[in-house]
């Protein structure tokens, strides 16, 4: 009974702490009456409502930008990497590409001061070369401005940066020799 009591207590404690009090902080002040059908992005998202903290007052604009991004990416048949917080892109695009799941400064990659930073950087560049990646695409505001990618762009003068829409940034690395 003691273990059962501990289980019930911890479940209740963490439910209140992380589910009720936190209320998904990013969406706490969002007007959910503005949600849009997520199937406007892709039929695989049917049954879901769409609203994010990035466009809380205009989810339709975000959907339009995501659709435009999806169309651009579908047209790029060359090998690419997509770095985004919109994790569904890997399932809605029919062409193959390599993508990390989620990318955060100091969490997904070691901080500059970390002894493994250089090893990670070399690993990343080696994978670009080995997989013959021609483009890096960033979907989401300021993803391309993370220090790792700023440094990558600054150190490799061959990188051509193109802003394709408000959400989609392209690093063209076809002229780079790694």
Walk through the language-model features, giving the residues of each.
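Signature aromatic-anchored transmembrane alpha helix within multi-pass, membrane-resident enzymes
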Residues: 1-26
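Conserved, well-structured beta-alpha core segment at the onset of a catalytic domain
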Residues: 1-9, 154, 158, 176
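Residues at the C-termini of beta-strands that transition into short coil/loop
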Residues: 2-5, 101-104, 164
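Non-transmembrane, interaction-prone segments in cytosolic or luminal domains
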Residues: 7-15, 104-107, 120-123, 176
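Short periplasmic/luminal acceptor-recognition loop of GT-C membrane glycosyltransferases, typified by
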Residues: 20-21, 32-105, 134-143
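Short, flexible coil/linker elements and helix-boundary hinge sites characteristic
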Residues: 74-75, 132, 157, 172
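Periplasmic/luminal catalytic loop of GT-C fold multi-pass membrane glycosyltransferases
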Residues: 88-92, 108-166
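Core SAM-dependent methyltransferase catalytic element
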Residues: 168-178
């Amino acid at each position: 009974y003691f273990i059962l009591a501990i289980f019930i207590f911890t479940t209740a404690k963490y439910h209140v702490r992380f589910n009720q009090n936190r209320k998904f902080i990013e969406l706490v002040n969002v007007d959910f009456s503005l949600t849009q059908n997520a199937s406007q992005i892709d039929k695989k998202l049917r049954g879901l409502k769409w609203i994010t903290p990035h466009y809380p007052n205009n989810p339709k604009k975000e959907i339009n930008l995501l659709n435009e991004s999806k169309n651009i990416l579908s047209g790029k048949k060359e090998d690419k990497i997509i770095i985004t917080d919109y994790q569904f892109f890997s399932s809605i695009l029919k062409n193959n590409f390599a993508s990390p799941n989620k990318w955060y400064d100091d969490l997904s990659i070691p901080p500059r001061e970390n002894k493994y930073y250089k090893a990670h950087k070399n690993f990343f560049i080696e994978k670009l070369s080995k997989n013959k990646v021609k483009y890096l695409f960033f979907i989401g505001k300021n993803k391309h401005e993370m220090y790792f990618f700023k440094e990558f762009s600054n150190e490799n003068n061959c990188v051509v940066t193109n802003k394709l829409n408000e959400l989609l940034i392209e690093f063209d690395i076809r002229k780079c020799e790694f």
